[in-house]
Swiss-Prot record:
Keywords: Lysosome, Membrane, Metal-binding, Transferase, Transmembrane, Transmembrane helix, Ubl conjugation pathway, Zinc, Zinc-finger. It is found in: Lysosome membrane. It catalyses: S-ubiquitinyl-[E2 ubiquitin-conjugating enzyme]-L-cysteine + [acceptor protein]-L-lysine = [E2 ubiquitin-conjugating enzyme]-L-cysteine + N(6)-ubiquitinyl-[acceptor protein]-L-lysine. This is E3 ubiquitin-protein ligase rnf152-B. One of its GO terms (molecular function) is ubiquitin-protein transferase activity. The keyword Metal-binding applies. E3 ubiquitin-protein ligase that acts as a negative regulator of mTORC1 signaling by mediating ubiquitination of RagA/RRAGA and RHEB. Catalyzes 'Lys-63'-linked polyubiquitination of RagA/RRAGA in response to amino acid starvation, thereby regulating mTORC1 signaling. Also mediates monoubiquitination of RHEB, promoting its association with the TSC-TBC complex and subsequent inhibition. Also mediates 'Lys-48'-linked polyubiquitination of target proteins and their subsequent targeting to the proteasome for degradation. It comes from the Eukaryota. The chain crosses the membrane at residues 167-187.
């Protein structure tokens, strides 16, 4: 039951898409949360933003956009990269298609979501674009402190997921072959029936 509420916290309850940098969780005046894309669509069709659940009105001053509404801090706290210290390791994508880790200070006012584009000043006042990337557990730098049995369990779990995916693909292919075979039988029978009628009408 807890996973259902956790999933519903991570997705917009209007379009059921997960929150992302493009679909930021925006907090309405009534304290309900929707993604910024749904709110922009509502804003395009009506003057004020009306909450689809409680019908409460969130007024935006003229010239203000939906992006200026505050992010829901509870949702951002769940989907943002967890930070134990002030610096969080992120990958910086370089023009040469190489990446390296760099500690990026996390802003207290606006946490970065995975996939967000930020900017980091490098020596010599050069600016480089920074993309926040979530890292799988086994690729994190403190991998040496994790007991070996936990690592093996994680690899086994991933193997089960891969094998279940492969068995799903095989099932789909098998069902498709059976359907094609049955369709061939039906078409063959139809051609035999039409030939019988031709023989009867001619003879």
């Amino acid at each position: 039951m807890e996973t259902l509420s956790q999933d519903s916290l991570l997705e917009c309850q209007i379009c059921f898409n997960y929150y992302s940098p493009r679909r930021r969780p925006k907090l309405l005046d009534c304290k309900h949360t929707c993604c910024s894309v749904c709110l922009q669509q509502m804003r395009a069709s009506q003057k004020d933003l009306r909450c689809p659940w409680c019908r409460g009105v969130t007024k935006l001053p003229p010239g203000y956009s939906v992006s200026e509404l505050p992010d829901d801090p509870d949702v951002v706290a769940v989907i943002a990269i967890p930070h134990a210290s002030e610096n969080t390791p992120v990958f910086i994508k370089l023009p040469s298609n190489g990446c390296y880790m760099w500690p990026l200070p996390v802003s207290k006012e606006r946490a970065l979501l995975p996939g967000d584009i930020g900017c980091r000043l490098l020596p010599g006042n050069q600016q480089k674009p920074v993309t926040v990337v979530t890292m799988p557990m086994e690729q994190q730098p403190l991998h040496g402190n994790i007991p070996q049995d936990i690592i093996e369990e994680e690899h086994e779990r991933r193997g089960v997921v891969k094998s279940s995916t492969w068995s799903g693909v095989c099932t789909v292919i098998l069902v498709a072959c059976v359907l094609v075979f049955l369709l061939g039988i039906v078409l063959h029978n139809m051609s035999c029936i039409s030939k019988r009628f031709t023989v009867i009408s001619c003879g």
